[in-house]
Amino acid sequence: MARALTRAGNAIRERHGISSLREITPEMAREYLKGRAGSIGQKGLDNERRALQLLNRAGCAMEGVKLERIRTDAGEIRYPSGRAYTPDQVSMIAAAQREHNALATQIAHAAGLRQHELYTLRPAREQPASSHRNWSPDRFAGREGVIYTVQGKGGLVREVLIPRSMANRLEARRLADFVMVRDQGIRYQQHYHIGAGRAWAASFRAAAERTIGWHQGPHGVRHAYAQERMRELQSSEFPYRQALAVVSQELGHFRPDITEVYLR
């Protein structure tokens, strides 16, 4: 709440040339909120309204005033939608798999990985991210864990975040030496004994059919990741377009419009 009030207050003070939050009038607050309605989600807009509402105390220009709720014009993410699985569905699918495939399913969901990227998982210190890209500092905002990297389409190496407890389980499956595997005509160095590629995808589909009665393929966990991250970022008051850009990079793309494909 304090962060939201600071952000809103600074923007209003700069726009109207006032020096104190106490000078913010109801008209200034309403104007600010209406302007924000086109760029942030409903939860973020409600947070800023509640923050500004704190200024209705004695001694403030907004004393006794109640700010009405304003509806956002920005894109709202309905979760889950399209090909996305819910977290409970992912858990059910993983519970029906053998341990090496179950861990792969959980990691793919937690980090938004493609099936072949599971082969390429490495600690970031051993496989640095591609340096020719400008990576957003907002990646993984609001989440904690251990940074790994994977090699995606076009050879792009990107950072991914894996929850610490999951990373500990992954490290327990580290191979003494990497093995070379071939999948769909491409050779990979694999450093962990976890499921990946076509074999993991087949295991995922079979487990999904047994547990939830349907599947959208393993790529659905990337859709779930994208939708979860958009919801998290918008709830943290990231503007819609900025959230699209952040999630795009987390998925290994650099086009915000690609993220919207995962939201359908």
Q: Which residue stretches match the model-derived regions?
A:
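Catalytic-site neighborhood detector that most strongly recognizes the C-terminal catalytic loop/helix
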Residues: 249-264
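Non-catalytic DNA-binding core/recognition domains of DNA-processing enzymes
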Residues: 1-63
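Conserved tyrosine-mediated DNA breakage-rejoining catalytic core shared by Y-recombinases
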Residues: 121-169
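The alpha-helix within a helix-turn-helix
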Residues: 108, 119, 247-249
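Active-site/catalytic core of tyrosine-dependent DNA strand-transfer enzymes
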Residues: 161-227
